[in-house]
């Protein structure tokens, strides 16, 4: 990093904090609430600019608030209560996010992904689908979609799933048909395959609660603001019709809107068969991994009344260790899992403070006043559309969720007529589906964009078309189906 060119990334969050803190406190807010909001906004700016890793930004924000808690976190009335010790209370708040069940669910899901990777099961599943369905280009598109679909429930990093598992496999396919990157031959088959790679990643990120870290962040924000939540099964059932529709429609739609020149061939199945032969038969570790994953999915879908989803994940990780699918070193050395663990817990802590200080309720009432006179359905749809389109301005799904989701939740809470579970699920689906809009919206986007098979103009055009289709289908199913299963 060059200090002469990057110093502003460090100063910008501090400048935002100072500017907001110096502004007059809005009517209806207490001084400590406004100062807390100033630091919270500075953290969001830090997450967007990333002068340091996001987890560090969030931890610095928490440290500032906890140290200055008499002026930022607690009201004068709280401080005046007999026996109130702000030092103990601020510490309790600072680490509260780490006890949130959502944090442990996503950490467990990361370990599942490690098991998939170490055993080779994820790669084997993708290769089997490519071998069976790769004779026709359209079916190859479905093979990419189904591969993502199978991996998504237990791979909460869509970057690890899309860029780490799927992309390394499908990037080998176009050259088998002399379809080369940055060449006129790219449209032969490579462009279609690469577009299917990124669009399948975005679709599957919306289908499952554990398919993308920001989904779980949203649930944490929802729980901290309202004490309501969505279980793994709620999310799955609420998304079911839209999921089926998108899984079946998208490969065909891409085939029509971005047609490959080559329609069929045998090179891909032969290559996949060679790779599978090199892997050998299904080993005992893969079988154990497959059995545990099926068991976890069954309990996530049907066991919500008997065991918490996070406890399912925690127990399965313990079994993975006992069965030697993964080792303890795999857990302690998994930098991606610990990184998400820390920033997600920290962001949930910050969002909890935003609610505890009274900002969420104040902002919700402010929005409710400006939206009064409109039907709840119109308000809900308008908020979803605005939230969806604002994706163009964010290069991080985490920053996008943390910056805008609390405001969306506040608006819904301020209008009791808006069904919060339905609204939050629509917001969650919009996070994943909206990632298709730009070549920088989510982790795998730059990987596929930089493959040499997706020209800039094509990516933006297809992103807008597919993004619009996704938004329309989301609104329709959100209004017609989700209330049936969630209310």
From Swiss-Prot:
<feature type="transmembrane region" description="Helical">
    <location>
        <begin position="313"/>
        <end position="333"/>
    </location>
</feature>
<feature type="transmembrane region" description="Helical">
    <location>
        <begin position="236"/>
        <end position="256"/>
    </location>
</feature>
<feature type="transmembrane region" description="Helical">
    <location>
        <begin position="93"/>
        <end position="113"/>
    </location>
</feature>
<feature type="transmembrane region" description="Helical">
    <location>
        <begin position="418"/>
        <end position="438"/>
    </location>
</feature>
<keyword id="KW-0997">Cell inner membrane</keyword>
<keyword id="KW-0813">Transport</keyword>
<keyword id="KW-0812">Transmembrane</keyword>
<protein>
    <recommendedName>
        <fullName>L-tartrate/succinate antiporter</fullName>
    </recommendedName>
</protein>
<dbReference type="InterPro" id="IPR001898">
    <property type="entry name" value="SLC13A/DASS"/>
</dbReference>
<keyword id="KW-1133">Transmembrane helix</keyword>
<feature type="transmembrane region" description="Helical">
    <location>
        <begin position="10"/>
        <end position="30"/>
    </location>
</feature>
<feature type="transmembrane region" description="Helical">
    <location>
        <begin position="54"/>
        <end position="74"/>
    </location>
</feature>
<dbReference type="GO" id="GO:0005886">
    <property type="term" value="C:plasma membrane"/>
</dbReference>
<feature type="transmembrane region" description="Helical">
    <location>
        <begin position="189"/>
        <end position="209"/>
    </location>
</feature>
<keyword id="KW-0472">Membrane</keyword>
<dbReference type="GO" id="GO:0015297">
    <property type="term" value="F:antiporter activity"/>
</dbReference>
<comment type="similarity">
    <text>Belongs to the SLC13A/DASS transporter (TC 2.A.47) family. DIT1 subfamily.</text>
</comment>
<keyword id="KW-1003">Cell membrane</keyword>
<feature type="transmembrane region" description="Helical">
    <location>
        <begin position="370"/>
        <end position="390"/>
    </location>
</feature>
<feature type="transmembrane region" description="Helical">
    <location>
        <begin position="465"/>
        <end position="485"/>
    </location>
</feature>
<dbReference type="Pfam" id="PF00939">
    <property type="entry name" value="Na_sulph_symp"/>
</dbReference>
<feature type="transmembrane region" description="Helical">
    <location>
        <begin position="292"/>
        <end position="312"/>
    </location>
</feature>
<feature type="transmembrane region" description="Helical">
    <location>
        <begin position="340"/>
        <end position="360"/>
    </location>
</feature>
<feature type="transmembrane region" description="Helical">
    <location>
        <begin position="137"/>
        <end position="157"/>
    </location>
</feature>
<comment type="function">
    <text>Catalyzes the uptake of tartrate in exchange for intracellular succinate. Essential for anaerobic L-tartrate fermentation.</text>
</comment>
<keyword id="KW-0050">Antiport</keyword>
<dbReference type="InterPro" id="IPR030676">
    <property type="entry name" value="CitT-rel"/>
</dbReference>
<feature type="transmembrane region" description="Helical">
    <location>
        <begin position="33"/>
        <end position="53"/>
    </location>
</feature>
<feature type="transmembrane region" description="Helical">
    <location>
        <begin position="393"/>
        <end position="413"/>
    </location>
</feature>
